């Protein structure tokens, strides 16, 4: 890709903005070296890297890249046997710390199932040198100072040095406290000259303290004297300082030697961390721009949805759909100047360079952009931020160069093609250049104000017209790109709006040739039809929104119905269970009495006792509420057989047929009791069949109403997040004020991931772990706004 094109399309300004998102000079350097790739697979890989980086930023907010430094020069010195200073050693240690933190960070993401294959493989290349990192951490601080903990010898030397310095200061302070001090000293302070402690003595008292004169004031009235009493202590202090320096040099040399054994590993770690910084910078830049990862085409197909120029004010820039490469390969944008035509060219060109550099683009999801081998641009910079003039000859020189180098994998952007010369000749040249560009197989977008080119899109099957919408009411362009509608002159309409006489306008119209007038009328008709279509489209969208609102209300009512139904069924079930429990208890009591009677001998059971027991069993049946229900069609009576499960109607109990006594009577086993029961008192019980899943017809496309809880136990991390996302939408549609998400306790990884996701969901008001009765920290309760 030519550097000239990058400059014309202002790609350098994108890179400058991108550097603000880098955390280190390594990331910044990678950005400065960034250039659009032309190999399709390379572009795919860099886009996937950025997408994985964006996924991590969405999940974690940031990555542990802070503290990364360019240490390649330090490693060069180690390579030739040199020693490093304390700050250089600290910087290498900082990189080792970042390497370890980054590797752990990436491993944590991989363990919870986040799919980041490219960045996961990149982190696998990082080598953790924990012992080397720890040795550096106890040896030097961030300013490069060697710490007392670097060696026992250094710690001892420094303790002795501090004590010696204290003794020197104590001795000198005694002179300052002397009652004659104010007379003999210029100032009651201890200072340093030639790295030795001294006091300021007046000239006339220089012999009073003895010792060594190290300096004097500019006037000569004050001498800085090291009294004789501290000369030995100062000498001792200097000797200790020399020992300290020697020990520090030994420590730095020792650490440097240990680092020299790991030069290649540290070099590779630093390179990998620089890549991470670069990738995360791209991801954060994309997030700041509200950009998306585009689909890539290797066949020259471009379909940008709501594409925005990234260097224009995001609050003011007009988003446009730009499509090319399927139904046509050439777009000719016609219409007056200052209408936003050049911005369209630059938007397409700049977004192409960004995509081929692995950057996300400012457009909507599902946008597609092509990967080109060459992007050529001949753009007059009248509307560029960097303004300059261009002559016809310089434009033509540029076009000649383009046509010599273009191929079928090229995108050409022509701005005001054929301008700067006689209009008739310029229009003819423009048409010929467009035909020549198409013959080379290139994708072309060109702007022109020549009316002759308005018919180009109709006369060439490979081309289409386009224009930038102009609002005659406000006398200003809307900057909205209209593909398929050529631009038209608005001179008459504008003149009328500004008050020009209708007679003059009528005469002017009569002077316009019929063909041009017909063309303008055709364009005007197209615009009217398009505006009508847009109006009808908006009305249809409004109706669709209304229908959607009604649908949501209906879904809410259905959800409320099922909730109420479930509640009533639950209440009824509880009541029925209580009744049955009571009936079972009474039946057990009766059976116990009968068993006792049986143990006492059959002869002991009186007839009236059996009748009484039978009556009590009948009374123990749960009372049912008679309802008037449609009578089911009478079925053919069942022919009873031994082993059939039956219900004894008079007792309300289930039993099993043992043997047939006669057509009118059977022996029936009811629990532990064998009884003779009349056939008319028996009801056949069908064997239970597997229950079929009840299908509920719903207006919601996803099936039955959402439940008030979602069970994620056993799910993989990313699958779980997708289910949570879908479930929250369904729960919101169902109108639930709050829901429960069951993730289990386990290692806590799934719980942590779900919690982080919920914190960032725009419709979530609050989250909390469940109470003990709700499932504790194995459940998250979500309250909606």
UniProtKB/Swiss-Prot annotation:
SUPFAM superfamilies: DNA repair protein MutS, domain III, P-loop containing nucleoside triphosphate hydrolases, SMR domain-like
Domain of life: Bacteria
EC number: 3.1.-.-, 3.6.4.-
Residues that coordinate or bind ATP: 335-342
Annotated Smr domain residues: 710-785
GO MF term list: ATP binding; ATP hydrolysis activity; ATP-dependent DNA damage sensor activity; endonuclease activity; mismatched DNA binding; ribosomal large subunit binding; rRNA binding
Keywords attached to this entry: ATP-binding, DNA-binding, Endonuclease, Hydrolase, Nuclease, Nucleotide-binding, RNA-binding, rRNA-binding
Keyword hit for RNA-binding: yes
GO biological process, one term: mismatch repair
Known role: Endonuclease that is involved in the suppression of homologous recombination and thus may have a key role in the control of bacterial genetic diversity. Acts as a ribosome collision sensor, splitting the ribosome into its 2 subunits. Detects stalled/collided 70S ribosomes which it binds and splits by an ATP-hydrolysis driven conformational change. Acts upstream of the ribosome quality control system (RQC), a ribosome-associated complex that mediates the extraction of incompletely synthesized nascent chains from stalled ribosomes and their subsequent degradation. Probably generates substrates for RQC.
HAMAP family: MutS2 (MF_00092)
Subunit structure: Homodimer. Binds to stalled ribosomes, contacting rRNA.
Family in the record: Belongs to the DNA mismatch repair MutS family. MutS2 subfamily.
The protein's name: Endonuclease MutS2
């Amino acid at each position: 890709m030519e550097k000239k094109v990058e400059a014309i399309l202002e790609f350098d300004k994108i890179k400058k903005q991108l550097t603000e998102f880098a955390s280190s000079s390594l990331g910044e350097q990678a950005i400065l070296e960034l250039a659009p790739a032309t190999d399709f697979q390379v572009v795919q890989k860099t886009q996937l890297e950025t997408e994985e980086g964006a996924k991590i930023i969405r999940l974690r907010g940031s990555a542990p890249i802070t503290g990364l430094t360019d240490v390649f020069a330090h490693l060069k010195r180690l390579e030739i046997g040199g020693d490093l200073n304390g700050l250089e050693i600290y910087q290498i240690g900082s990189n080792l710390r970042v390497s370890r933190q980054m590797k752990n960070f990436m491993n944590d993401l991989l363990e919870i199932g986040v799919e980041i294959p490219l960045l996961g493989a990149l982190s696998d290349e990082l080598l953790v040198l924990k012992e080397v990192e720890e040795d550096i951490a106890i040896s030097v601080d961030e300013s490069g100072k060697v710490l007392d903990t670097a060696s026992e010898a250094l710690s001892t030397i420094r303790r002795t040095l501090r004590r010696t310095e204290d003794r020197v200061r104590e001795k000198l302070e005694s002179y300052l406290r002397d009652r004659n001090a104010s007379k003999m000293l210029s100032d009651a302070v201890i200072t340093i000259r030639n790295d030795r402690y001294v006091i300021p003595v007046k000239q006339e008292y220089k012999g009073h303290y003895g010792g060594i004169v190290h300096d004097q004031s500019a006037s000569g009235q004050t001498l800085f004297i090291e009294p004789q009493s501290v000369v030995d202590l100062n000498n001792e202090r200097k000797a200790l300082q020399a020992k300290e320096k020697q020990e520090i040099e030994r420590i730095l040399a020792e650490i440097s030697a240990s680092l020299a054994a790991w030069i290649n590993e540290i070099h590779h770690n630093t390179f990998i961390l620089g890549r991470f910084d670069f990738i995360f910078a791209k991801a954060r830049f994309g997030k700041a721009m509200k950009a998306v990862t585009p689909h890539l085409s290797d066949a020259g197909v471009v379909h940008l949805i709501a594409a925005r120029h990234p260097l224009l004010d995001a609050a003011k820039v007009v988003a446009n759909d730009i499509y090319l490469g399927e139904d046509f390969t050439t777009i000719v944008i016609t219409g007056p100047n200052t209408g936003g035509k050049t911005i369209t060219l630059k938007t397409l060109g700049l977004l192409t360079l960004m995509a081929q550099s692995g950057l996300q683009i400012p457009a909507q999801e599902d946008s597609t952009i092509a990967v080109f081998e060459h992007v050529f641009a001949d753009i007059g910079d009248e509307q560029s931020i960097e303004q300059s003039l261009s002559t016809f000859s310089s434009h033509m020189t540029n076009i000649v160069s383009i046509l010599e180098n273009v191929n079928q994998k090229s995108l050409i952007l022509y701005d005001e093609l054929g301008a700067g010369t006689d209009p008739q000749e310029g229009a003819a040249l423009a048409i010929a250049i467009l035909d020549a560009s198409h013959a080379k197989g290139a994708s072309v977008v060109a702007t022109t104000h020549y009316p002759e080119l308005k018919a180009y899109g109709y006369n060439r099957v490979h081309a289409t017209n386009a224009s930038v919408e102009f609002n005659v009411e406000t006398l200003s362009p809307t900057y909205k790109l209209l593909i398929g509608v050529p631009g038209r002159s608005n001179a008459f309409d504008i003149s009328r709006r500004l008050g020009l006489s209708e007679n003059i306008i009528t005469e002017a119209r009569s002077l316009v040739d019929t063909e041009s007038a017909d063309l303008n009328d055709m364009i005007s008709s197209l615009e009217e039809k398009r505006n009508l279509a847009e109006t009808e489209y908006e009305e249809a969208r409004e109706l669709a929104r209304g229908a959607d609102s009604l649908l949501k209300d209906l879904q809410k009512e259905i959800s409320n119905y099922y909730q109420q139904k479930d509640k009533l069924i639950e209440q009824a079930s509880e009541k029925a269970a209580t009744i049955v429990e009571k009936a079972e208890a009474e039946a057990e009591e009766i059976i116990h009495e009968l068993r006792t009677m049986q143990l006492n001998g059959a002869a002991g059971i009186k007839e009236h006792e059996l009748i009484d027991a039978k009556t009590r069993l009948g009374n123990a049946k749960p009372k049912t509420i008679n309802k008037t229900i449609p009578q089911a069609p009478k079925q053919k009576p069942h022919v009873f057989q031994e082993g059939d499960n039956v219900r004894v109607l008079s007792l309300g109990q289930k039993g099993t047929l043992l043997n047939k006594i006669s057509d009118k009577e059977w022996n029936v086993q009811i629990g532990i009791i064998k009884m003779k029961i009349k056939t008319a008192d028996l009801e056949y019980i069908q064997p239970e069949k597997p229950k079929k899943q009840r299908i509920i017809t719903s207006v919601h496309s996803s099936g039955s109403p959402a439940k008030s809880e979602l069970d994620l136990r056993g799910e993989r991390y990313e699958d779980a997040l997708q289910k949570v996302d879908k479930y929250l939408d369904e729960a919101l549609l169902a109108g639930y004020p709050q829901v429960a998400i069951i993730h289990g306790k386990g290692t806590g990884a799934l719980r942590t991931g779900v919690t982080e996701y919920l914190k960032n969901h725009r419709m979530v008001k609050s989250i909390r772990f469940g109470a003990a009765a709700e499932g504790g920290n194995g459940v998250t309760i979500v309250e909606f706004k």
